Amino acid sequence: FSCIKGHTTDTARIKQAARDHGREIKTMSTTPHHLNSPRLDRLGEAIQHVLGQRSILWSNNSKTWGCKGRNLYGYYRIKNELVVMCQGFHNGDLIELIDTLKHEGWHAVQHRCRNGVPYLDDQQIAARLPQRDAINVHNYHPKQRRLESEARVIAKIDDAQWIQLV
């Protein structure tokens, strides 16, 4: 069978899968890739206080955690209680990374600490939600809009106040 053009053995497929997996693992980390930021560290520690030590995953274009090829800044994965930061999509923008970490971290608080009940009331959210975010939130399922809007608002407060709320 080795003479048939394009045919590979199981061994070759296994070796290729192992190489692919090795490359994939290198794109995942519990710390930001090539970025040293005490500010990100402090925010991350607050999230880890809620979810546990290995609760933030930094993905640099990883396929495994759903970042590659999608316009995602990050997400909170309820099933694993895991904040996934799609660092490759941020193009090194620290302010954007911080905003996303606070936003996704707040989703963790909403789920883990508040049982899906918003911290802010509708008037507080409406008064603080920027128009562009209000428009964007309409792309979400109606049941998710209030929590998504709140996470966008909470992400904008200063770090010390955010950490205190978490």
What residue spans do the PLM features occupy?
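Second-shell loop/turn segments in exported
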Residues: S29-L35, C86-N91, I95-E96, V137-H141
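Catalytic Zn2+-binding segment of zinc metalloproteases
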Residues: G105-D121
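Active-site scaffold of zinc-dependent metalloenzymes
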Residues: T64-I95, H111-R112
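Short alpha-helix carrying the canonical HExxH Zn2+-binding catalytic motif
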Residues: D93-V109
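Metalloprotease/metallohydrolase-associated module, dominated by Zn2+-dependent proteases
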Residues: P118-V166
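Zn2+-dependent metallopeptidase catalytic core
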Residues: P32-S55
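Acidic/histidine-rich, surface-exposed loop or edge segments in extracytoplasmic proteins
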Residues: Q16-T31, I78-V84
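N-terminal low-structure segments adjacent to metalloprotease catalytic domains
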Residues: F1-R23
